[in-house]
Amino acid sequence: MLKYALHSGGMPRNRLLRQLSAHIFRRSYSSNIRNIGILAHIDAGKTTTTERMLFYSGKTRSLGEVHRGNTVTDYLTQERERGITICSSAVTFPWRGNRINLLDTPGHIDFTMEVEQSLYAVDGVVVVLDGTAGVEAQTVTVWTQADKHKLPRLAFVNKMDRPDADFDKCVNDLRTKLETQPVCIQYPSKNQDGLLTINDVITLEQLTWQPKDLGRSYSKTKLEPSDDLRQLQEKRNELIDQLSGLDDELADVVISTESFDNVSNALIERALRRATCQQKVVPVLLGSAYKNVGIQRLMDAVNTYLPAPEERNQIYDCFGNEVAGKVFKIVHDKQRGPLTLVRILRGEIKRGMRLICSRGQAEVVSKLYEPLADEYREVGAVQSGDVVICAGLKSTVTGDLLTSSQTALRNAQKRLKQSQGTVSPDEDEELDTDELFGIDRQIPDAVYFCSIEPPSVSSQTAMEQALRQLQREDPSLRVSYDSVTGQTVLGGMGELHMDIIKSRILSEYKIDVDLGPLQIAYKETIESPSLTTLSVEKEIAGSKQNVSLTLEVVKDQGELFSLDKSPENLSNLNTLRPRTLQVIRKGSVSALERGPRVGGQVVDTQIRLHNAIIGRGTADSFVMATAAQCVQKLLSTSGTRLLEPIMALQIVAPSERISGIMADLSRRRALINDVLPKGERNKMILVNAPLAELSGYSSALRTISSGTASMTMQPSGFSGMNAVDESLAERRVQGLE
């Protein structure tokens, strides 16, 4: 094939050789990359696992410990002080001939947006479970996020050195709570010294780590004939049987062989890899990151079972050799300015290259860096499939798609549409990049608001600049200006989120801002349908502006805006230009952002346009303002009810403390869903409670339980309120409570 190509006409031999060499290099380079995320519930040991990977790969010379505050990936002051991950961080390290790009993500629910954006950059994930707790609340959240991105995954059961660890329960949790098909390729055991060892199901070996050299080396021992070996052989046979039902190649061998013992390890691994990449199974491994057990085999599994970049993201093949890169994070460096983390999906990014983001802005890459958390090594170019940090991008935001030019983007869009059979080659239409490539920019609703004030008037500009930079890093941070009070208002995902923002502004920007009291982000919904006509006529700068709109608000959880299709109104609406309808829609929907009672977003409400008469020469801005004014009038007429945010809590405490905790919860308007046994001495309470009643609840729970209880909390939607609670909420918002 190569000989034929070199002697075919139409292209100089040297140029063809260069192109073939570049293509072959890219393919082999890409096949040796693994882009992975590491996900977990808070305190499952995710960051410790990452630090061990860096140490054993030779990337770091000492073990980073969360409790010592010397980790590579948790480099923010707030992360090291609190012992939690707040921002996603990217690290690159070599392992057995491959290059692993790993994204360490937060485990706390307040920073779930960090996880969501990081998953756009990876091809597979490792989900870390606490061996003493199994699948927890945030485990379910991150698993659902991985499902959304269709990511192959491995499960790593950590803390298996602990006496209360339960491997079988963790595996059962994966099967029942996450509705997946776990495949155990390791089982825990103990050596004669009582230390954790691992039995490998595929090789039938016992793996023992050496504590004297910090787990750098481990021995493999073939199990002697015994009950342990017989049980492990049964597990191996079960694994082969399970995989043969999912993989045709393995099934053919099983059918033709006389015994499962004749099925080679390599054949099992290949079948398991195919099943994992197709998301049919989840391989389960185990270890203890803190005790330095099992990490090397976890990295081996990343290489063996998770996909290379070229096996994923085929939708971007439409770019050919042009650049396609997904922006998944932005950080601000004091010396280098904004640094943009990009997953290169196709093509090659070089230093000095000009790029276009999917929103149309032109950018120039001044420098490129290889990621290692907050340390950077400059490089000249980075190939498809890799992760890179770009300096010099000024307008790009998280979620943008970067490409070589607008022409390259348009051509890729059209090729993709043609491959889907939805557009002809010569059709010229405006295409939605986000919709076409499945880019979701949806930002979760804030659950808390508070005002933010600089220490002095002279610090106002610096504070606004700091907020702009933090908002570019963290899309879930909302910043707005309240025209009524004249205050800057922050919206965030929780108390911890807001506290971290204040702390970062002080530590990174040296501005000691003052945050006002936290306000609950209530929503509003209409009590009853209402219809009205608003006619406005004014003369502005000598031009007559004339608008008459008939609008209605109705209860509806679907579209925000619709047209009345009744015969008497349809003829009028058909005369309106699409642009005019869009202007009316934009003005109408904007009025739903601020309800009449507490300024909350109006939800479960649809605006219906019945009639519109617009005078010649009337400006779009005037039409938009009239539509907003009409909807505001309707909301006041119909009246609104308040909806309050509800949180789902999981509380684990000793059995003797449960009654006191439940009594306190009942005073907080909580709905107790279930009380389940949790081990021999503990119970777990599953409860929903209004966020307004949970201010400072962590401290209260510690007091009630004498420090023996633990809690996780995450948003669980909104719920209506009775008249008394509504009145209290209004007084709180007005600052009267």
From Swiss-Prot:
<dbReference type="InterPro" id="IPR035647">
    <property type="entry name" value="EFG_III/V"/>
</dbReference>
<dbReference type="InterPro" id="IPR009000">
    <property type="entry name" value="Transl_B-barrel_sf"/>
</dbReference>
<dbReference type="Pfam" id="PF22042">
    <property type="entry name" value="EF-G_D2"/>
</dbReference>
<dbReference type="GO" id="GO:0005739">
    <property type="term" value="C:mitochondrion"/>
</dbReference>
<feature type="binding site">
    <location>
        <begin position="40"/>
        <end position="47"/>
    </location>
    <ligand>
        <name>GTP</name>
    </ligand>
</feature>
<dbReference type="InterPro" id="IPR009022">
    <property type="entry name" value="EFG_III"/>
</dbReference>
<dbReference type="InterPro" id="IPR020568">
    <property type="entry name" value="Ribosomal_Su5_D2-typ_SF"/>
</dbReference>
<keyword id="KW-0496">Mitochondrion</keyword>
<feature type="domain" description="tr-type G">
    <location>
        <begin position="31"/>
        <end position="310"/>
    </location>
</feature>
<dbReference type="Pfam" id="PF14492">
    <property type="entry name" value="EFG_III"/>
</dbReference>
<dbReference type="InterPro" id="IPR035649">
    <property type="entry name" value="EFG_V"/>
</dbReference>
<keyword id="KW-0648">Protein biosynthesis</keyword>
<dbReference type="InterPro" id="IPR000640">
    <property type="entry name" value="EFG_V-like"/>
</dbReference>
<dbReference type="InterPro" id="IPR041095">
    <property type="entry name" value="EFG_II"/>
</dbReference>
<dbReference type="InterPro" id="IPR014721">
    <property type="entry name" value="Ribsml_uS5_D2-typ_fold_subgr"/>
</dbReference>
<dbReference type="InterPro" id="IPR053905">
    <property type="entry name" value="EF-G-like_DII"/>
</dbReference>
<dbReference type="InterPro" id="IPR031157">
    <property type="entry name" value="G_TR_CS"/>
</dbReference>
<feature type="binding site">
    <location>
        <begin position="104"/>
        <end position="108"/>
    </location>
    <ligand>
        <name>GTP</name>
    </ligand>
</feature>
<dbReference type="GO" id="GO:0032543">
    <property type="term" value="P:mitochondrial translation"/>
</dbReference>
<comment type="similarity">
    <text>Belongs to the TRAFAC class translation factor GTPase superfamily. Classic translation factor GTPase family. EF-G/EF-2 subfamily.</text>
</comment>
<keyword id="KW-0809">Transit peptide</keyword>
<comment type="function">
    <text>Mitochondrial GTPase that mediates the disassembly of ribosomes from messenger RNA at the termination of mitochondrial protein biosynthesis. Not involved in the GTP-dependent ribosomal translocation step during translation elongation.</text>
</comment>
<dbReference type="InterPro" id="IPR027417">
    <property type="entry name" value="P-loop_NTPase"/>
</dbReference>
<dbReference type="Pfam" id="PF00679">
    <property type="entry name" value="EFG_C"/>
</dbReference>
<dbReference type="Pfam" id="PF00009">
    <property type="entry name" value="GTP_EFTU"/>
</dbReference>
<dbReference type="GO" id="GO:0005525">
    <property type="term" value="F:GTP binding"/>
</dbReference>
<keyword id="KW-0547">Nucleotide-binding</keyword>
<keyword id="KW-0342">GTP-binding</keyword>
<protein>
    <recommendedName>
        <fullName>Ribosome-releasing factor 2, mitochondrial</fullName>
    </recommendedName>
</protein>
<feature type="binding site">
    <location>
        <begin position="158"/>
        <end position="161"/>
    </location>
    <ligand>
        <name>GTP</name>
    </ligand>
</feature>
<dbReference type="InterPro" id="IPR030851">
    <property type="entry name" value="EFG2"/>
</dbReference>
<dbReference type="InterPro" id="IPR000795">
    <property type="entry name" value="T_Tr_GTP-bd_dom"/>
</dbReference>
<dbReference type="GO" id="GO:0003924">
    <property type="term" value="F:GTPase activity"/>
</dbReference>
<dbReference type="GO" id="GO:0032790">
    <property type="term" value="P:ribosome disassembly"/>
</dbReference>
<feature type="transit peptide" description="Mitochondrion">
    <location>
        <begin position="1"/>
        <end position="29"/>
    </location>
</feature>
<dbReference type="InterPro" id="IPR005225">
    <property type="entry name" value="Small_GTP-bd"/>
</dbReference>
